[in-house]
C-alpha cells in the first residue's frame, strides 16, 4: 500500500473481540482471500479459540501460522463443503458460492431468534474459472425457510449492471498479452 510505506499489514483494532473472548465460540472463515485471513495469525494468539475453515482455506491458514511459528494444533477445524457445524446455541451451515478463489462460502447461521445469512464475498458467476458453481438451490431453500437478516459483502455495490464472468476476464487477459 503506497499510502503507508514500510507497513506490511494493517488490521482493525481487535480490542472489542479480545474484551469478549470468554464469549467467543470460534472464528468461522468464509474463504481464503487475504483481506479475510491476513490478520488471523496476528490476532489469534490473543484469542486462542477454534478456527473453522474449509480444506483449501485451512491450508493457507496453516501456512500463515507456520510463518509466525505459532502452533495451532487442535484449534484448526476443517469443515467439509456444504456441511454444518454446531457452536451451541448456533448452527452454522457452509453454503458453496462462486468467487475468484477456491471454496468460497456463505454462512447460514441458525440462531434462537431466526436465520442469519452471511454471504462472505461472492459473485453469481455462471461460468466460474475455478471451483464449483453457486449452490443456488440451497440458497432458495434457505430463503424459503426465512431469513431474519442478511449480512452481505460487496466490493462493487455502487457499480451498475452485472459484473462479467471471471472466465471472460481471464480470456480477455490472454488475448491482450503474453501470460
Question: Where are the language model's segments positioned?
Answer:
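His/Asp/Glu-rich metal-coordinating catalytic cores
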Residues: 1-28, 33-172
